[in-house]
């Protein structure tokens, strides 16, 4: 999303706890081009792209002691985060279930993690914390409303005459599932459903702030997600007869549609027709070229190499269909899928990252695929 380039071109998987930044200092990001064009830029919430822990780790600390709070100098600058990648301002918690568990503003720690988390008990809605340092007052239920409030404070400071770009990365509905009490029971689909309802409420607060500030008519808002539901979706299927992936097979980490097909909702008054729907296959990597076109930033051929311009799609204008010849999808190392029109080719014996549960297969009328398959080919129109 931030680079216009598929992550598998550089690495597979995710940045783990205590990993360094996935970015090189001269990497292209959309925040950098907004900043160059005079926009104020801010990021709030999750930053699951690594930090420079070496910069704050005390000399001579053994790897097995990385989880200890005393292994770090929390008063030092914490580099490698959003403010090194084009954002003027950042407030967030890094990653909700990865240490350190504390608030970070720009490149400094606001709350100091002093107590250790050795083993976390599962929270009521599901999910745990990885071992590592935690601030004494840390409460996971505060994270979603706090990051939203900080984003609203920043937005309310903006003037209609000063362009701005905000990247608001909610922790919800990622593990741990921590909906606040006022949302309990709202969804009738357990704590996960309630967490989704709370997320919707936070999005609503952002839209209201734009309206009250006189910014809504000239602000492009995009709402999306990074992957499908976690594996607790199987339990919700049994408990509530609710399947988070809709009519699609798969959950997070699967290369089936349910693993990566996500919402993509756009609002831009006067530019995009309200209620319009497109069935064009698009990707979040397309935002880079799209944003560059909107702000008049010329991109070189060596950056945002996987990105396509979505403007004609969003505006309902004529364009050569399809937008792209094919879309490449990837999950674990060596497991890829190629989407072309209604067809999906999975270059693996199964699109699942783990054994699929029997009750799930039976309820959705699916079959498990054996390890001897050389690959799988689906027509999504006939077999979603």
Where are these regions (language model features)?
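Formylglycine-dependent sulfatase
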Residues: 1-376, 380, 384
């Amino acid at each position: 999303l931030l680079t216009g380039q598929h992550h598998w071109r550089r690495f597979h998987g995710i940045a783990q706890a205590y990993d360094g930044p996935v970015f090189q200092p001269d990497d292209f990001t959309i925040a950098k081009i907004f900043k160059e064009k005079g926009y104020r830029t801010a990021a709030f919430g999750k930053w699951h792209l690594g930090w420079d822990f070496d910069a704050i780790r005390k000399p001579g600390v053994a790897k097995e002691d990385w989880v200890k709070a005393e292994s770090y100098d929390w008063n030092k600058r914490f580099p490698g985060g959003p403010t090194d990648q084009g954002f003027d301002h950042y407030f967030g918690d890094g990653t909700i279930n990865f240490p350190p568990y504390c608030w970070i503003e720009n490149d400094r720690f606001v709350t100091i993690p002093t107590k250790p988390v050795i083993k976390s008990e599962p929270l009521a809605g599901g999910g745990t914390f990885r071992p590592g340092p935690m601030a004494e007052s840390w409460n996971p239920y505060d994270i979603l409303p706090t990051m939203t409030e900080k984003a609203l404070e920043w937005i309310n400071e903006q003037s209609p005459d000063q362009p701005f770009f905000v990247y608001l990365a909610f922790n919800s509905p990622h593990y741990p599932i921590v909906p606040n009490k006022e949302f309990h029971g709202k969804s009738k689909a357990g704590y996960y459903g309630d967490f989704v309802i709370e997320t919707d409420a936070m999005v609503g607060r952002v839209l209201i702030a734009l309206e009250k500030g006189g910014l809504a008519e000239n602000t492009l808002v995009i709402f999306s997600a990074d992957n499908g539901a976690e594996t607790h979706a199987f339990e919700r299927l049994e408990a509530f007869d609710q399947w988070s992936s809709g009519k699609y097979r798969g959950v997070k980490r699967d290369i089936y549609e349910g693993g990566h097909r996500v919402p993509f909702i756009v609002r831009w008054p006067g530019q995009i027709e309200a209620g319009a729907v497109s069935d064009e296959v698009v990707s979040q990597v397309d935002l880079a070229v799209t944003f560059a076109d909107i702000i008049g930033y010329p991109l070189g051929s060596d950056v945002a190499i996987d990105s396509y311009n979505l403007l004609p799609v969003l505006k309902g204008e004529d364009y050569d269909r399809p937008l792209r010849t094919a879309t490449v999808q990837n999950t674990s190392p060596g497991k890829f899928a190629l989407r072309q029109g209604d067809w999906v080719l999975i270059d693996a014996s199964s699109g699942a990252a783990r054994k699929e549960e029997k009750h799930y297969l039976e309820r959705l009328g699916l079959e498990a695929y054996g390890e001897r398959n050389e690959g799988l080919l689906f027509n999504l129109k006939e077999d979603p």
